[in-house]
């Protein structure tokens, strides 16, 4: 129901433990959506630990980098907010009309598993879930800006250079005025 409902929605929220990093046709489809107001993705990074031993460090670094590459906000044609929540194990998917709460991860691999869940079509229940659950998860998550933040840093750096030039010019003018 969630995937079929995408054509009638302007918003999508995905809260999931795992986004399969090898091939994820569902995520690739989301990247192509253009008429959405917003997509919010909140996920964990499976296999991420507080401490690593031996060659696990390199393996974990590669897995984390796969997630970052896969969820790079600039790779989506619509506005997307990506968050990481390392305590999250829930699977909740919301569109404008439908909510799924269940055991299925957001991946193509889940279609081959026996999964259980409920579908909610009540607007009131959807709104209540958003307000009481999703917002709390989002507030306790870490926002991932990806390369987008670098773009903004470069823009701000350009503005700072212009401000420095204006400041220098003003100083010179003030000095000239004081000399007269």
Protein language model regions, located:
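Conserved RecA-like P-loop NTPase helicase motor core
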Residues: 81-91, 103, 109-110
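Signature of lipid phosphatidyltransferase scaffolds
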Residues: 100-179
């Amino acid at each position: 129901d969630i995937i079929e409902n995408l054509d009638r929605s302007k918003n999508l929220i995905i809260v999931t433990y795992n986004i399969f990093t090898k091939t994820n046709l569902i995520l690739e489809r989301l990247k192509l959506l253009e008429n959405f107001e917003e997509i919010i993705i909140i996920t964990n990074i499976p296999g991420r630990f507080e401490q690593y031993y031996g060659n696990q460090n390199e393996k974990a670094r590669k897995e984390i980098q796969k997630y970052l590459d896969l969820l790079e906000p600039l790779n989506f044609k619509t506005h997307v907010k990506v968050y990481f929540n390392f305590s999250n194990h829930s699977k909740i998917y919301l569109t404008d009309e439908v909510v799924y709460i269940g055991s299925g991860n957001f991946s193509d691999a889940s279609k081959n598993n026996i999964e259980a869940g409920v579908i909610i079509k009540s607007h009131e229940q959807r709104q209540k879930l958003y307000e009481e659950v999703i917002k709390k998860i989002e507030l306790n998550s870490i926002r991932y800006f990806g390369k987008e933040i670098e773009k903004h840093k470069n823009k701000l750096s350009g503005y700072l250079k212009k401000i420095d030039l204006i400041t220098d010019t003003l100083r010179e003018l003030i000095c000239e005025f004081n000399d007269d």
